[in-house]
């Protein structure tokens, strides 16, 4: 069996765990959480020819982007989210991922907030 990661989440006060091996698996897991919690979302939203964000969610403040990362370089992600936040349609961004540096990215770019959540994983 290959190596994977497990994350836990809560649906209607019930804790659940999911496994993921790559970013597409994590996208599917996040999508399942949105569905289970009846959160309206769009997946792989094209913001421009170059920019496709993993998810958008409509909140009271407007459209919020969700970008997932399980590997990659911090500076590459900063360039990517800077592009995403330059779009008028995106009011804020959630970055969710496993790299150690996720919680060290800025909390604001382009005068828009960035919310960060590092997934602490168990490898099996």
Protein language model features and the residues they cover:
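Non-catalytic C-terminal interaction segments of nucleic acid-processing enzymes
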Residues: 1, 58-60, 115-124
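Well-ordered alpha-helical segments embedded in enzymatic catalytic cores
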Residues: 29, 79-80
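Generic alpha-helical hydrophobic packing signal
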Residues: 19, 23, 44, 57-59, ...
